[in-house]
């Protein structure tokens, strides 16, 4: 077992693990030797970190704006390694927000935000400047949403990770063409790396850094 980031371990070659504050599973996941198994086949962030552990400088004490939090599964793993940090988890679905609120009752470093990531100005009173912007949304204008949120909330030199979903943008064009176009549309950032995600068809992760 190898620690690749503070609190994040490679458990065998194809699994990650975190050190949770509680030994009780949150979503039916396995607990092995006190570590919480994180399956990259089920989480795009886990798939990215297994190939490119890009969160150095963010964990363990950074602030994160997470767009597209859904019911909070990946948010909870990120919370495990942000032991001294904070996650602002933005989700538009009231049903998913109920799950996020239950999660936040167990994790003090998660703040659920019911809101539309395409309207970042609506949560200005809640979200502070952040060290990482993480986006996993299904809207068509994914690059625009990421760029607008980064311009408001991401600190200079802050890290941005965008999971681009090709089929949410265009169901007919080739995925590679969609990825190229969305990356070109990102503004105010320098793209550091584009990472293919095994087990996540028609998705790619884009890692970028905000310009000063």
Curated annotation (Swiss-Prot):
Entry annotated with the keyword tRNA processing: yes
Entry keyword set: Methyltransferase, RNA-binding, rRNA processing, Transferase, tRNA processing
Superkingdom to which the source organism belongs: Archaea
EC number: 2.1.1.-
SUPFAM superfamilies: S-adenosyl-L-methionine-dependent methyltransferases (SSF53335)
GO biological process: one example: box C/D sno(s)RNA 3'-end processing
Annotated residues for binding of S-adenosyl-L-methionine: 73-74, 91-92, 116-117, 136-139
Pfam families, per the entry: Fibrillarin
UniProt keyword annotation of RNA-binding present: yes
Record field: transmembrane: none
Xref: Gene3D superfamilies: Vaccinia Virus protein VP39 (3.40.50.150)
Record GO terms (molecular function): histone H2AQ104 methyltransferase activity; RNA binding; rRNA methyltransferase activity
Family: Belongs to the methyltransferase superfamily. Fibrillarin family.
Functional note: Involved in pre-rRNA and tRNA processing. Utilizes the methyl donor S-adenosyl-L-methionine to catalyze the site-specific 2'-hydroxyl methylation of ribose moieties in rRNA and tRNA. Site specificity is provided by a guide RNA that base pairs with the substrate. Methylation occurs at a characteristic distance from the sequence involved in base pairing with the guide RNA.
Quaternary context: Interacts with nop5. Component of box C/D small ribonucleoprotein (sRNP) particles that contain rpl7ae, FlpA and nop5, plus a guide RNA.
Record-given protein name: Fibrillarin-like rRNA/tRNA 2'-O-methyltransferase
Species assigned in the record: Methanothrix thermoacetophila (strain DSM 6194 / JCM 14653 / NBRC 101360 / PT)
Record gene name: flpA
